A protein has these predicted regions:
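Long alpha-helical rod scaffolds of large eukaryotic non-enzymatic complex subunits
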Residues: 1-262
C-alpha cells in the first residue's frame, strides 16, 4: 500500500501547493480537474466502507474496485511530479509529455482529459489575442509577452505622429511588429507550435489596427471556441482564419485613407 498511498498524498499536496493564486490559471484549471478525481475517489472509498460494514467486501472485490484508482493516482503522480513548479504552456507540455510516454489507452485518455481542462484558460487568452489583439495575461503564462522597451518606443512614435501612409507603416507599425511583442519559444505549447507565428502576427496586426485606426472590425463569422483535441484540425483552421482576418484588416487600414489625426 506504500506506493499507492504515497501517490495519493503527493497528488493532494500538489493540488494544495500549485492551486494557489500565483501559479496561474492553467494550474488552477488543472488542480480543479484533479480535485474532481479526488472527490470521485472519496465517494468510492465510502461505498467500499459500506460494503465492508455489511460484510460483503472480499479481498478480491476490494482489489477489483480499487485497482483502477491505483492506476489513476499512479498516473496523476507522474503528471504532477513532471509539471511541479511550472506555469502556463510548460504545464501543458508536461502533461503532453506524460501522455506521449503512456502506452495504455486509459492513461492517454486521462491525460487528454487533463489537457482539455487545463488548456481552457490558455485558449481563452489565445482567443482574446487573435480575435481582439488584446494581451490579457495577468500570470505571465502566454508564450507572447509585451516588451516594455518596445512599448515605450511605440508610444514615442505615437506622440510624434506620422504624416503619411508610408510613415505609419515604417513608424508606429514597425515598432509594434518588431519591438512591442515578443514570442517566448520555450513557453509555446507543443500542440500550438506549428501555428505560433500566425498566432503572434494575428494579434500584432489587430493591436496595430485598433491602436492606429481606432476602427470597429466586423466579428469573424466562423469564430468558434478554441479547445484542445488530439485532432487539431479545427483549431488550426480557426487560427488560420483569424490570421487572414487580421492581415486583411491591417492591409485595408494601410491602403485606405489615413485615420483622423494622423
Amino acid at each position: 500500500c506504500h506506493a499507492p498511498c504515497g501517490h495519493y498524498a503527493a497528488v493532494r499536496q500538489f493540488v494544495e501547493a500549485q492551486g494557489r493564486y500565483e501559479y496561474g490559471a492553467v494550474n488552477h484549471a488543472l488542480c480543479a480537474a484533479i480535485r474532481e478525481l479526488l472527490k470521485e475517489f472519496a465517494v468510492k472509498v465510502c461505498q467500499l466502507e459500506s460494503l465492508l460494514r455489511a460484510g460483503s467486501l472480499s479481498i478480491a472485490k476490494l482489489w477489483y474496485h480499487i485497482q483502477p484508482s491505483m492506476d489513476t493516482f499512479a498516473l496523476l503522480y507522474r503528471v504532477t511530479a513532471h509539471v511541479y513548479g511550472s506555469i502556463g504552456g510548460l504545464v501543458l507540455n508536461g502533461i503532453q509529455d506524460v501522455m506521449a510516454r503512456s502506452s495504455l489507452t486509459t492513461a492517454q485518455e486521462l491525460c487528454e482529459y487533463l489537457l482539455q481542462q487545463a488548456s481552457q484558460p490558455y485558449f481563452e487568452t489565445v482567443s482574446r489575442w487573435i480575435y481582439e489583439g488584446r494581451l490579457d495575461d495577468p500570470y505571465a503564462e502566454f508564450f507572447i509577452s509585451e516588451h516594455m522597451a518596445g512599448q515605450r518606443a511605440a508610444q514615442n512614435d505615437a506622440r510624434a505622429g506620422a504624416r503619411s501612409r508610408d510613415e505609419r507603416v515604417g513608424g508606429l507599425g514597425a515598432d509594434f511588429w518588431h519591438k512591442h511583442f515578443v514570442l517566448e519559444e520555450r513557453s509555446v505549447p507543443q500542440f500550438l507550435a506549428a501555428s505560433r507565428e500566425k498566432i503572434l502576427h494575428a494579434g500584432k496586426y489587430l493591436h496595430v489596427f485598433f491602436s492606429v485606426g481606432g476602427k470597429q472590425l466586423q466579428e469573424p463569422g466562423n469564430q468558434g471556441r478554441l479547445r484542445y483535441s488530439r485532432r487539431q484540425r479545427d483549431c488550426v483552421e480557426a487560427i488560420d482564419a483569424a490570421y487572414r482576418r487580421a492581415s486583411a484588416a491591417l492591409l485595408g487600414l494601410f491602403m485606405g485613407p489615413p485615420p483622423v489625426g494622423l
